[in-house]
Curated annotation (Swiss-Prot):
Name of the protein in its database record: Proteinase inhibitor
Gene3D superfamilies per the UniProt record, alphabetical: 3.30.60.30
Disulfide bonds: C3-C40, C6-C24, C7-C36, C13-C49
Coiled coil: none
Xref: InterPro entries: Prot_inh_I20, Protease_inhibitor_I20
Organism for this UniProt entry: Solanum melongena
Site feature Reactive bond for trypsin, where: R38, N39
Amino acid sequence: QICTNCCAGRKGCSYFSEDGTFICKGESNPENPKACPRNCDGRIAYGICPLS
């Protein structure tokens, strides 16, 4: 289980719950991170990111 939330997640990554339900896409660009809360979204179990 990863600790992140939709705001702080990497842009381009998709985040899913334990049972594979799509939760959201990440919104934070690593080059220019958004000001995001550092809380964990308990629904997010893993993220899938493109290999770019």
